[in-house]
Swiss-Prot record:
The keyword Chloroplast applies. The active site is at 165 (proton acceptor), 284 (proton acceptor). The basic functional RuBisCO is composed of a large chain homodimer in a 'head-to-tail' conformation. In form I RuBisCO this homodimer is arranged in a barrel-like tetramer with the small subunits forming a tetrameric 'cap' on each end of the 'barrel'. This is Ribulose bisphosphate carboxylase large chain. It comes from the Eukaryota. It is found in: Plastid, Chloroplast. Mg(2+) binds at residues 191, 193-194. Its EC number is 4.1.1.39. The record marks 324 as: Transition state stabilizer.
Length: 459
């Protein structure tokens, strides 16, 4: 058959409802909003074509390859309940389309081009199924949950953190002082803010030195292992690695990276360096809401979370759930499980479109951070369980007596909640009561409770 020039409907080639997916396929669930007059099958096929082998017209060179082997296929379409003209299009991609061990390449293929397509009014990537064969090409988190607990010698409870505020403007010496006070008071970690890199008021090397000094002083006084997330994010990959090398030379346990603004290539390089040199890696998701906030367009955070587990990170910020809507709680817990567990069953009520097997890829600790304080502690302990980091920035530094008492209040509240839970008490119902009891023998906690009057949780 000779080459037949011209434009034909995508669905003739790329919509294949009879296709049986393979174990090695990467599967994607897209929320598609077609333009008026575009049938859903065509819209689904557009997505499959433009994110794999297709282009707008038939080309002569199609005859030089086996399209059936390499093309993406839209294999199922379902309407979205309660939404007019929205569909979930399921697309299967052959594994050969992707470079091994490259999150960058995976995203460039799947979401690189198709989101600006005229036939679509809006498009959102809701979930990805990463096949075992592809998972195995990634190093993943530098260390993972178990190794981190062993390094820190901390078991049976969530870890406590605090972001140092004001985030910009402190000198390195004053910054280090705040770090020391928080760690001395009982926190496990303190944190550079995501936008603390190396600015005129505080260059990175000075900050690293003063924070390391604070860390060692607090360790000596408390007998506990302490950490400060030193933000190694920089303008170039070379500079980022240089900062990580200096952190390693100081002997600190953990560094930090802003993985979306820094980019997946830089993040994966840093994760490899961290595994090779015994550093834990804390990941901040600055810029995520630009990508994931719109319900009908962009990429859902669960996909960004999966991508981070592949690229590599030991902690990642994942929202707080507290005080949010019920549905959001289930959805958040869905991607928290995707970060921590080895094997996650498909569960649409939690937003999980595919069963995901991570084989032996280490897990990532979810970090709850943003607007939380001591009254939230029972809810956070209940919702996130032991394998999490609870971060109180203002909830530590906003204590009326200062930073160290703020840290004491948080640690006492956490220990009280963990003890109550281990005794079989119901944190959901008795949370406020547990905190009030603990106040009796901790004036620091009592003062914190007074400032942030109790919040009512309807579990």
């Amino acid at each position: 058959v000779g080459f037949k020039a011209g434009v034909k409907d995508y669905k003739l080639t790329y919509y294949t409802p009879d296709y049986e997916t393979k174990d090695t396929d990467i599967l994607a669930a897209f929320r598609v909003t077609p333009q008026p007059g575009v049938p859903p099958e065509e819209a689904g096929a557009v997505v499959a074509a433009e994110s794999s082998t297709g282009t707008w017209t038939t080309v002569w060179t199609d005859g030089l390859t086996n399209l059936d082997r390499y093309k993406g296929r839209c294999y199922h379409i379902e309407p979205v309940a309660g939404e007019e003209n929205q569909f979930i299009a399921y697309v299967a991609y052959p594994l050969d389309l992707f470079e091994e061990g490259s999150v960058t390449n995976m995203f460039t293929s799947i979401v690189g081009n198709v989101f600006g397509f005229k036939a679509l009014r809006a498009l959102r990537l809701e979930d990805l199924r990463i096949p075992v064969a592809y998972v195995k090409t990634f190093q993943g988190p530098p260390h993972g949950i178990q190794v981190e607990r062993d390094k820190l010698n901390k078991y049976g409870r969530p870890l406590l953190g605090c972001t140092i505020k004001p985030k910009l403007g402190l000198s390195a010496k004053n910054y280090g002082r705040a770090v020391y006070e928080c760690l001395r008071g009982g926190l496990d970690f303190t944190k550079d803010d995501e936008n603390v890199n190396s600015q005129p008021f505080m260059r990175w090397r000075d900050r690293f030195l003063f924070c390391a000094e604070a860390l060692y002083k607090a360790q000596a006084e408390t007998g506990e292992i302490k950490g400060h997330y030193l933000n190694a994010t920089a303008g170039t990959c070379e500079e980022m690695i240089k900062r990580a090398v200096f952190a390693r030379e100081l002997g600190v346990p953990i560094v930090m990276h802003d993985y979306l603004t820094g980019g997946f290539t830089a993040n994966t390089s840093l994760a490899h360096y961290c595994r090779d040199n015994g550093l834990l890696l804390h990941i901040h998701r600055a810029m995520h809401a630009v990508i994931d906030r719109q319900k009908n367009h962009g990429i859902h955070f669960r996909v960004l979370a999966k991508a981070l587990r592949m690229s590599g990170g030991d902690h990642i910020h994942s929202g707080t759930v507290v005080g949010k809507l019920e549905g959001e709680r289930e959805i958040t817990l869905g991607f928290v499980d995707l970060l921590r567990d080895d094997f996650i069953e498909k569960d649409r009520s939690r937003g999980i479109y595919f069963t995901q097997d991570w084989v032996s890829l280490p897990g990532v600790l979810p970090v709850a951070s943003g607007g939380i304080h001591v009254w939230h502690m029972p809810a956070l302990t209940e919702i996130f369980g032991d394998d999490s980091v609870l971060q109180f920035g203002g909830g530590t530094l906003g204590h009326p007596w200062g930073n160290a008492p703020g840290a004491v209040a948080n640690r006492v509240a956490l220990e009280a909640c963990v003890q109550a839970r281990n005794e079989g008490r119901d944190l959901a119902r008795e949370g406020n009561e547990i905190i009030r009891e603990a106040c009796k023998w901790s004036p620091e906690l009592a003062a914190a409770c007074e400032v942030w009057k109790e919040i009512k949780f309807e579990f």
